């Protein structure tokens, strides 16, 4: 059985072609950035922590891959991208093994998501891995779910995938695909 993150990767890989512009909105340890770069996509990755950039840069170098790494919040994505995107991925929560006070926030996540939905091409997808077992996580989860549940169904298809018999607030995936 696929984990939510494995399903996110598989769903994105179905639509991403070489040279497509894609976004890692929360680069963290760099795993998603490397995954996207392995697909030969043009990757732009964001994080507010220098540690995340350092870890991602090392992973990319080890894999002999490249991506544009930006030390800035994903809410500023519009300042860096002007062309359409094929896909994006978010891992909401905090950077493991770092300061748990530095977390993604509902307001900035919604701002980034709104901008990326506008930039998303027909058939493009956005994956949101929602980790909410930390202070502030429930608010962000509820805010994101309220927003995506109201996206017009003729324009976007929104799906939720996650375990239902797991303890300790298991993470889940929200996938969005643009229909029009």
Language-model segment annotations:
Residues 89, 93-111:
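Mobile active-site "lid"/loop adjacent to the S-adenosyl-L-methionine
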Residues 137-180:
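Class I S-adenosyl-L-methionine
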Residues 49-51:
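Conserved SAM/SAH-binding beta-strand->alpha-helix loop
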Residues 1-21, 31, 54-82:
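S-adenosyl-L-methionine
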Residues 119, 123-130:
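Conserved beta-strand signature within the Rossmann-like core of class I S-adenosyl-L-methionine
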Residues 42-47:
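Conserved SAM-binding motif I beta-strand of class I
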Residues 29-41:
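Conserved SAM-binding loop of SAM-dependent methyltransferases across substrates and taxa
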């Amino acid at each position: 059985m696929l984990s939510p993150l494995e399903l996110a990767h598989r769903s994105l890989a179905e639509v991403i072609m070489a040279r497509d512009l894609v976004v890692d909105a929360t680069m963290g340890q760099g795993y998603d950035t490397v995954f996207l770069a392995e697909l030969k996509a043009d990757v732009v990755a964001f994080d507010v922590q220098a540690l995340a950039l350092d870890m991602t840069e090392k992973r990319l170098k080890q894999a002999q891959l490249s991506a544009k790494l930006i030390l800035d919040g994903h809410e500023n994505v519009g300042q860096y991208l002007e062309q359409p995107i094929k896909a994006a991925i978010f891992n909401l929560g905090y950077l493991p093994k770092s300061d748990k006070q530095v977390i993604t926030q509902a307001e900035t996540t919604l701002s980034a998501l709104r901008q990326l939905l506008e930039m998303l091409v027909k058939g493009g997808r956005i994956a949101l891995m929602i980790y909410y077992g930390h202070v502030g996580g429930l608010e962000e989860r509820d805010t994101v779910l309220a927003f995506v549940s109201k996206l017009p169904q003729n324009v976007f298809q929104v799906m939720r995938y996650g375990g239902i018999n797991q303890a300790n607030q298991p993470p889940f995936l929200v996938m969005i695909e643009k229909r029009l």
